[in-house]
């Protein structure tokens, strides 16, 4: 199977995907209602799409192609309201968060589609453990070589995206000590991590052909990389974020990525090198484990900062691009998160500390999603 052609798209357009938790409303455990929700909303007109995910306790929403922060917020709120109305009709709840706080993975039911059943056979229990919930952001690229440049230069900022979105401190009733425990589940898959270091589309096509020849992959969907090209959309897809607890935060993070992309492609401040990845896994771990207080090492200078400090300095650098895109309000929210060092994981721990109940924490997650 050959790699599909890269469709050139309008630079810096973006789309947002959010994987959502579906919970019951008596003890707020996950429940099997994905197919029922899809049946209920199949005739609704929304500015995007709603699709099944690998288990019946999940659903994915996606916006259309957005150009501004204002549009992304409006699209996400409209889709959210449609889903919440349908969920209320079924007497189930919806919430964000990268993991469910106390669900047992063995109770999950794989959705009955050929691809999901194939993944279940291939990966065994990992498929059910993959009931985790992420935000993906697509960024439009003018050509395939620009997409690969953006992919590798954007990798420098992966710790920012993880720490800002982190919302998965609890797994199976236990505080993991991580801000984003979700990514530990993703990292278990053999084709996860970072993309190979190639900077031309010809080289990427050659790599893809070799992987297909080995029988390891059939399509780009088989790669679970932190950032991957999506040739059929003409985008790169940033995949490291936990699903935030609110659509407004999801939109702000998406626009931070959009603004960074404009800075990287127009200003070309980074010359990507293979050695940039020497600290990649360390920086990624620090963001997952410690959130905004984690350490971030600049791969080119070796300078160490906290992730929150690095975000604030980055916001200063990209301010002209925020003005050009109209994303000032989004980046103001990102700055407030970085200065306070309070992400959704910190908020969730605060709820559990006050209420002494993971069930109550999930109930409040549902309220945050509706707000």
UniProtKB/Swiss-Prot annotation:
The keyword Membrane does not apply. GO terms for biological process: modified amino acid biosynthetic process. Its EC number is 6.3.2.2. It is an enzyme of class 6 (ligase). InterPro entries: GCL_type2/YbdK_subfam, GCS2, Gln_synth/guanido_kin_cat_dom, YbdK. One of its GO terms (molecular function) is glutamate-cysteine ligase activity. The keyword Ligase applies. Keywords: ATP-binding, Ligase, Nucleotide-binding. It comes from the Bacteria. It catalyses: L-cysteine + L-glutamate + ATP = gamma-L-glutamyl-L-cysteine + ADP + phosphate + H(+). Belongs to the glutamate--cysteine ligase type 2 family. YbdK subfamily. ATP-dependent carboxylate-amine ligase which exhibits weak glutamate--cysteine ligase activity. This is Putative glutamate--cysteine ligase 2. It comes from Paraburkholderia xenovorans (strain LB400).
């Amino acid at each position: 199977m050959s790699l599909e052609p890269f469709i050139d798209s309008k630079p810096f357009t973006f789309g947002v995907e959010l994987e959502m938790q579906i919970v019951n409303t008596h003890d707020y455990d996950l429940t099997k209602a994905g197919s029922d929700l899809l049946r209920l909303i199949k005739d609704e007109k929304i500015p995007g799409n709603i699709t099944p995910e690998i288990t019946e306790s999940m659903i994915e929403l996606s916006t259309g192609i957005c150009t501004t922060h204002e549009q992304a917020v409006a699209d996400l709120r409209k889709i959210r309201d449609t889903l919440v109305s349908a969920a209320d009709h079924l007497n189930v709840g919806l919430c964000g968060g990268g993991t469910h706080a106390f669900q047992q993975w063995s109770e999950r039911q794989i959705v009955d589609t050929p691809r999901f059943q194939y993944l279940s056979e291939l990966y065994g229990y990992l498929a059910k453990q993959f009931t985790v919930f992420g935000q993906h952001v697509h960024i439009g690229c003018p050509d395939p070589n620009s997409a690969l440049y953006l992919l590798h230069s954007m990798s420098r900022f992966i710790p920012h995206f993880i720490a800002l979105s982190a919302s998965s401190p609890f797994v199976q009733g236990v505080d993991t000590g991580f801000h984003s425990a979700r990514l530990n589940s993703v990292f278990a898959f053999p084709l996860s991590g970072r993309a190979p270091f190639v900077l031309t589309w010809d080289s990427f096509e050659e790599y893809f052909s070799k992987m297909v020849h080995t029988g390891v992959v059939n399509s780009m969907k088989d790669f679970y990389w932190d950032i991957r090209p999506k040739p059929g959309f003409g985008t790169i897809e940033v995949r490291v974020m936990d699903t935030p607890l609110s659509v407004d935060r999801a939109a702000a993070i998406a626009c931070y990525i959009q603004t960074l992309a404009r800075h990287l492609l127009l200003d070309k401040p980074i010359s990507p090198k293979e050695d940039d990845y020497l600290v990649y896994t360390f920086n990624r771990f620090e963001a997952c484990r410690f959130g905004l207080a984690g350490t971030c090492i600049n791969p080119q200078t070796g300078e160490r900062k906290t992730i929150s400090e690095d975000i604030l300095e980055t916001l200063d650098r990209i301010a002209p691009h925020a003005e050009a895109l109209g994303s000032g309000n989004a980046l103001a929210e990102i700055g407030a998160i970085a200065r306070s060092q309070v992400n959704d994981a910190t908020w969730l721990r605060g709820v559990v500390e006050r209420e002494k109940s993971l069930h109550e924490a999930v109930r409040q997650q549902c309220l945050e999603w509706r707000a």
